[in-house]
Amino acid sequence: MGAYASLSAVDLGVMTVKELLRRANIDPQSEVIDEVVFGQVLQAGVGQNPARQVALGAGLPVSTPCTTVNKVCGSSLKAAMMAANSVRAGEYKAIIAGGMESMTNAPQLLLGQRKGTKMGDSTLVDSMIHDGLWDVYNDVHMGTTGETIAKECGIDRETMDAFAARSQHRAAEAWENGWFDWETFAVDVPQRRGDPVRIEKDEGVRPGTTAESLGNLRPVFDKDGSVTAGNASTLNDGASAVLIAEASFATSQGWEIIATIEDYCTSGVEPERVMSAPIPAVNTLLSRNGLDVLDVDVYEHNEAFASASCAVAQEIGIPEDRFNLHGGAVSLGHPLGASGTRCLITMLGAMRRTNAASGIVTLCLGGGNAVAMYVRRPE
């Protein structure tokens, strides 16, 4: 219920794609864009093919193919993978990939009512939790899996709170120094009365957060556990998008090549161990590309829970000074379908700032999968 509460997921997606087109100096009707692939998880009530709604809302031609992806938290990074596949196969030359989510506007569901209820009460089901945050295999909230990885990898409460505080500090520093400016844009939100309200920054960043203050919060999912509202990601509305193109075509259009996509993969583990799924995903990319963990300059992991980020860094051996340099979902938020390309873009921003040559981004996703992508900046 933040500043974007009055905007739908499609509204957010449309604004984001319009801004991408503006920055790339693309006339929407020029037919330069071959396809739009967009992720969204909470699609109930949104209408047919939300990606198509975004494309037409942004002014792209009716001839533009559009695909909506639901791979839970990995949706938009999977959209980027699918776009890369099409470009590599020679099918298309330029694709917009991204994702969107309005967790605020996810509806309450009245399941089973098409057949009717003869007697007794009916119960509303929160589609945000039911479709986005619930492990259907073990019938538990995803927060429980944050507790599972903490126990499995020996991540204590103090370590989690210290990581969460660092995420807040790094995000605040990035905003203060303008490091997010290249990847964000201001949004004017219409009001019922008066002028629109301009939103220029993430609402969840809290610069004054300390590990000590976080230590005062009670566990949420297990009374004897360690996952709290302060060391977990937040519920958010947002959208993100990238332009994926064949290199020579990008050059011919005058587009800056920010990075090249070298490799990507999806891994799988037991659903209850979902938070550990990025570990084999990242290790697969390292092995397949003949890399040691220290051969990669920057890593970006979606901070669904601080316990998960701590475990991923610990088990792979990623140094603190290469991991989530501008903060992550604990501070910036986690609008499910938008987070994949948001993480990719944030990592690219950190790579630009530090002049890093390479990076790996990864996200876990409900059901026991994880997605990961390896990129390099042009020399």
Regions from the language model: what does each represent?
Residues 1-7, 124, 151, 210-276, ...:
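Condensing-enzyme catalytic core mediating Claisen C-C bond formation in acyl metabolism
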Residues 5-74, 78-95, 100-118, 127, ...:
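Conserved beta-ketoacyl condensing-enzyme motif
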Residues 5-15, 23-26, 159-252, 315, ...:
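N-terminal extracellular/periplasmic Venus flytrap/periplasmic-binding protein-like
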Residues 7-8, 40-95, 137-141, 208-234, ...:
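Conserved catalytic cysteine-centered active-site region
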Residues 10-25, 50-51, 79, 142-149, ...:
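Short, well-ordered amphipathic alpha-helical segments that serve as non-catalytic structural scaffolds
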Residues 69-101, 144, 150-179, 241-248, ...:
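Active-site-proximal alpha-helical scaffold in enzymes
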Residues 106-143, 206-228, 233, 379:
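Glycine-/small-residue-rich "gating" segment that lines the acyl/pantetheine channel
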Residues 145-147, 183-185, 191, 262-331:
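Active-site pocket-lining segment
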